Each structure stands twice: as structure tokens, then as C-alpha cells.
């Protein structure tokens, strides 16, 4: 089954919050190295999609599975689609879009996503976990997801009142065919204003199943504080 599953990691060098974020050192490995190595432990069909020669150079000791992409993409989804086209992925193959700033996604979670995707009718699958504190609700770097009783997403926000809010984890799964359809849509106003590409899916009536992961996952890396917390987490392991 893993032969028909691909993990694609979009990564760009520019970041409004952290300069050269993918290359930030976290206990002896760069952020993007940690994400990529985790993915390769799950499947050899793991690739980084980037527009940066610096990122490519940083990863060459790990794997040659680097796809160079345009620097004009407005979202990771669009970058992943370009990479998927270059890899000639089949229409019904499952693509997992793993965010390049999520270094602590466990293998157990990836396997859960694959299983839930096969069991639930959906266009897109993503992940949520428990809110750790009230700070998650008020932190704009922590994306919240609300879902209905069948675990289909109803909204994503950075801050707001939700009926049943959970912390959104940056991973998406879809077939190549669905990915192609999504990237042909115009970005929505809410997507651009909130910098949440998943709103494009939702506002165009694509069903998003939210796989609930009932274990703690450290936050992704968006700020210098996140970097410090990641180092503390690794030092405790």
C-alpha cells in the first residue's frame, strides 16, 4: 500500500516570522532535515518540494528526493501540485502534504491518517489534536479547527469562538485528482486574508475529514519561542 502513497513536503526559504526558517538549527539538525527524515522513515516515496537551492544543498546528505519548484506559488498546496506533476503521480494515489515546519509528527499519526482516509468518504483528510491551554485559543500561530459530529471540518480560524475547537495539525491527504482540481480553483478572500489554504477547499465544498489524534504533539515552528520550546522538548526525550 505504501508504494501508492507519497509524502510531499513544501518548503520555501522566505518567512515573515522567522528568517530562513527551514534552515534553523534545532539541536544539531535543521528544521527541514528533521521533517524530511521523519517522512523517509515512513516511506521512501517522500520528497521535499522547494524553490531554494540552499534547502536542496542542506538536504542532499539525507536524500536526493528534492523537487525544485517555482518561486511564484502562493501556497504549499500549489507547490505540492507542481512536484506531484513532475513525479507523474497517478490520479488515485494518496498524497500526504506534510508541512515543512512540523518536525514532531509521529509515525503513528501518519498511519492513522492513511487508515482513516481509507475508511471515510472525503475529498481531503487532515488532523486535529487537543488544545493544550487557553493560549492556543488566543495564539494566531495556532490554527483551530471546528468539526461536526461526524468529524468533518466546518471552519478553520487562527482566533475565534468555536463550538468544539481543536488544534489543527499541518498535514493534508488527498488523491492527485483532487489536488489537481483544488489548485485549479481561484484562491478565496478568506484564504488570502487568513493565510489558511484549507479555506479554499472548504469554501468550494470539498469535504474535509478531520482525523482526531488523542496524544500530545509539540507545536510546529513559527516563532523563536517555538524553536526554544522544541529544543527543550528534545532535551527532555
Residue ranges and their predicted role:
Residues 47, 53-115:
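Short phosphate-binding loop-to-helix
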Residues 105-188:
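Conserved core of the sugar-phosphate nucleotidyltransferase
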Residues 2-50:
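N-terminal glycine-rich phosphate-binding loop and ensuing alpha1 helix
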Residues 50-51, 105, 174, 222:
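A conserved hydrophobic position in a structured secondary element of the catalytic/binding core
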Residues 43, 89-92, 119-123, 206:
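Short, high-confidence coil segments that cap the C-terminus of an alpha-helix
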Residues 13, 70-76, 215-217:
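Short, acidic/turn-prone active-site loops that include or flank metal/cofactor-
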Residues 165-237:
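Conserved alpha/beta core of the MobA/IspD/sugar-nucleotide pyrophosphorylase nucleotidyltransferase superfamily
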